[in-house]
Amino acid sequence: MARILLLFLPGLVAVCAVHGIFMDRLASKKLCADDECVYTISLASAQEDYNAPDCRFINVKKGQQIYVYSKLVKENGAGEFWAGSVYGDGQDEMGVVGYFPRNLVKEQRVYQEATKEVPTTDIDFFCE
């Protein structure tokens, strides 16, 4: 039995590493500029550093610019989070979309209003 487990365990680890994991949902709805949440809502500036607690979030340094793509609808006393990606030259997080606390940033420029309320999906909280 132990041999079977030892043979099975590396395969399970490989599958998880290749496919990633689905994390808990932070909210059931989000606000977007369009139905598919692909258009940028705004450009925001980080007011302080933020270290991501897990793979759903992005690390942010004070002063970095962040493109905002969606805003989670706050539920039952949970934190208010937005999804976006860091903008800048040579940043490790550049191009990676993740969540960050709304109170961490100040919107500098609004491109489109976030008026479309859409349900979140499992892929919104997927980690590679």
From Swiss-Prot:
CDD domains: MIAL
Domain SH3: 39-110
PANTHER family reported in the protein's UniProt record: OTORAPLIN
Gene name linked to the record: OTOR
The keyword Secreted appears for this protein: yes
GO cellular component entries: extracellular region
Short name of one Pfam family: SH3_2
This protein's name: Otoraplin
Annotated source species: Homo sapiens
KW Disulfide bond (keyword) present: yes
GO BP terms: cartilage condensation; sensory perception of sound
Keyword field: Disulfide bond, Secreted, SH3 domain, Signal
Species classification: Eukaryota, Metazoa, Chordata, Craniata, Vertebrata
Tissue: Highly expressed in cochlea.
Family the UniProt entry places it in: Belongs to the MIA/OTOR family.
Recorded superkingdom: Eukaryota
Subcellular location(s) per record: Secreted
Primary localization class, coarse: secreted
Leader sequence segment: 1-17
SMART domains documented for this protein: SH3 (SM00326)
Disulfide bonds: C32-C37, C55-C127
